[in-house]
UniProtKB/Swiss-Prot annotation:
Active site: S517
Entry's EC annotation: 4.2.1.9
Superkingdom of the source species: Bacteria
Positions annotated to bind Mg(2+): D81, D123, K124, E491
Assembly mode: Homodimer.
Cofactor: [2Fe-2S] cluster; Mg(2+)
Pathway: Amino-acid biosynthesis; L-isoleucine biosynthesis; L-isoleucine from 2-oxobutanoate: step 3/4; Amino-acid biosynthesis; L-valine biosynthesis; L-valine from pyruvate: step 3/4
Organism: Shigella dysenteriae serotype 1 (strain Sd197)
Record-given protein name: Dihydroxy-acid dehydratase
Signal sequence, renumbered to the chain: none
Gene: ilvD
Length: 616
């Protein structure tokens, strides 16, 4: 039977110094036999998804201590991708994921904590904490800050829903007046919480439910709603139960690697495809699987993408629905219920509540449950009041959205499309694959062919788009923006948003070895692997080359002969030390980012560190 890890620092005469320091934090003799549980918070005033988390760590800690544990809170960093977008700050976003994972490992192992409650929310924070949890493999529960309410404003005598992407598009559209742009900007992000669409943050928080590491409602219950408080209270109580089950009863089912099994990863990816989640989730699930030592690869994702339909459509793929609407329709469990009825899920999985998938659906699926309290929870709705306070309102929808033919969540029979919301494409310059969010691609451009316009930085591409140098029919190629080449694998939300603002959203394609924001829609193909900086063939594309995209058949092809590509590769290699680097890009890259780049793998490996370079 495993002993408490914390006993290393609390027992034995030779640990008198450690105990003296623990006493200085408020611990007493009575605490030294209890489990020490880390409350891993991520409060910051920089990020609306985290601005309300300051007091929530204390809330969890109080429940831990009431249940017989000792709570010790610390914070991780948290980068706001939206604020970092469109300038050099975006180079730091993806690398922050590794820093978060490492910092959690450092704190938890340095102080021998027994378990964790991870309070996350936004883009790289949930993945970073997830990677750390599976690396450490000690009991853990995730509880996120929750989604932002959708913005609303009146334009042309109509009330419309808004989010961050609308503000970006209208701000760049020369046809939009200053007053309208200002109105949209002021209305787009009304409350605390993660941005209101199915962007990366909300996608990842939904996936923690499917992985079994968070409670039902975690991905969709609004940050502002009073019902969300119960998730934090429950997490504090439940983590003590899980911790004692593992350390005192030798019950390994309480460990995250046994909850987030390969079957659970397959369920999470199935959910992601069905709900049209952010393409960034592919990166993060691949990275998390490696930490869990699970053989889960792009090949698995490709297989799932070919059989899973799209059952949910949310902003940015439509402006009709945001996360508050997903919640009203039953949230993540509502989507999982439809997938289960379609025979598309692994049922032999459990969650942190100890429930199997069938038990979870019976209790929490709004189409099955007889529990009025559960139905009431899924009626939790927005208040439409600007606030930075968690749990500040208790508004409810009059009814649930249980219309599986025309509502937000659909049954298999009434799916938005038989193909899911994400697809893996392969071709002669994406030998290891690339990713497209098909949920955001108009049917008219599922097959597309056009001449390449090649740029070696996001900045140059933006300048060309706004300067009118990109025209209908073009395929914009942005390279040397991968994990190693950027470094940092920038998101390309500004180029895709500006294509929309220039009226080219359905008339152009964009291909990159970088990545896209969860707010991206359109024919936007990212994660091209291998990346240019690793000798990938995307580095051989020249202006005017024809590129053919065939999403239905999962293909992407540079229409250049093998002989010509071989000649171009030979010429590239002849550049010596400058081979596979941008020819005309000036970019200041810090030592910290160079250190990240030196170990980074391409996107098909999750952009994690190359362990072979570290002897791993």
């Amino acid at each position: 039977m495993p002993k408490y890890r914390s006993a290393t620092t609390t027992h034995g005469r030779n640990m008198a110094g450690a105990r003296a320091l623990w006493r200085a934090t408020g611990m007493t003799d009575a605490d030294f036999g209890k489990p020490i549980i880390a409350v891993v918070n991520s409060f910051t005033q920089f990020v609306p998804g985290h601005v309300h988390l300051r007091d929530l760590g204390k809330l969890v800690a109080e429940q831990i201590e009431a249940a017989g544990g000792v709570a010790k809170e610390f914070n991780t960093i948290a980068v706001d991708d939206g604020i970092a977008m469109g300038h050099g700050g975006m180079l730091y976003s993806l690398p922050s994921r590794e820093l978060i994972a490492d910092s959690v490992e450092y704190m938890v192992n340095a102080h021998c904590a027994d378990a964790m409650v991870c309070i996350s929310n936004c883009d790289k924070i949930t993945p970073g904490m997830l990677m750390a949890s599976l690396r450490l493999n000690i009991p853990v529960i995730f509880v996120s800050g929750g989604p932002m309410e959708a913005g609303k404003t009146k334009l042309s005598d109509q009330i419309i829903k808004l989010d961050l992407v609308d503000a970006m598009i209208q701000g760049a559209d020369p046809k939009v007046s200053d007053s309208q742009s200002d109105q949209v900007e002021r209305s787009a992000c009304p409350t605390c919480g993660s941005c209101s669409g199915m962007f990366t943050a909300n996608s990842m928080n939904c996936l923690t439910e499917a992985l079994g590491l968070s409670q039902p409602g975690n991905g969709s219950l609004l940050a502002t709603h009073s019902d969300r408080k119960q998730l934090f209270l429950n997490a504090g109580k439940r983590i003590v139960e899980l911790t004692k089950r593992y350390y005192e009863q030798n019950d390994e089912s309480a460990l995250p690697r046994n909850i987030a099994s390969k079957a659970a990863f397959e369920n999470a990816m199935t959910l992601d495809i069905a709900m049209g989640g952010s393409t960034n989730t592919v990166l993060h699930l691949l990275a998390a699987a490696q930490e869990a030592e699970i053989d889960f690869t792009m090949s698995d994702i490709d297989k799932l993408s070919r059989k899973v339909p799209q059952l949910c459509k949310v902003a940015p793929s439509t402006q009709k629905y945001h996360m508050e609407d997903v919640h009203r329709a039953g949230g993540v469990i509502g989507i999982l219920g439809e997938l289960d009825r379609a025979g598309l899920l692994n049922r032999d999985v459990k969650n942190v509540l100890g429930l199997t998938l069938p038990q979870t659906l019976e209790q929490y699926d709004v189409m099955l449950t007889q529990d009025d309290a559960v139905k009431n929870m899924f009626r939790a709705g927005p208040a439409g009041i600007r606030t930075t306070q968690a749990f500040s309102q208790d508004c409810r929808w009059d009814t649930l959205d249980d219309d599986r033919a025309n509502g937000c969540i659909r049954s298999l029979e009434y799916a938005y499309s038989k193909d899911g919301g994400l697809a893996v494409l392969y071709g002669n310059f994406a030998e290891n694959g690339c990713i497209v969010k098909t949920a955001g691609v108009d049917d008219s451009i599922l097959k597309f062919i056009g001449p390449a316009k090649v740029y070696e930085s996001q900045d140059d591409a933006v300048e060309a788009i706004l300067g009118g140098k990109v025209v209908a029919g073009d395929v914009v190629v942005i390279r040397y923006e991968g994990p190693k080449g950027g470094p940092g694998m920038q998101e390309m939300l500004y180029p895709t948003s500006f294509l929309k603002s220039m009226g080219l959203g359905k008339a152009c394609a964009l291909i990159t070895d970088g990545r896209f924001s969860g707010g991206t829609s359109g024919l936007s193909i990212g994660h091209v692997s291998p990346e240019a900086a690793s000798g990938g063939s995307i580095g051989l594309i020249e202006d005017g080359d024809l590129i053919a995209i065939d999403i239905p058949n999962r293909g992407i092809q540079l229409q250049v002969s093998d002989a010509e590509l071989a000649a171009r590769r030979e010429a590239q290699e002849a550049r010596g030390d400058k081979a596979w680097t941008p020819k005309n890009r000036e970019r200041q890259v810090s030592f910290a980012l160079r250190a990240y780049a030196s170990l980074a793998t391409s996107a098909d490996k999750g952009a994690v560190r190359d362990k072979s370079k570290l002897g791993g």
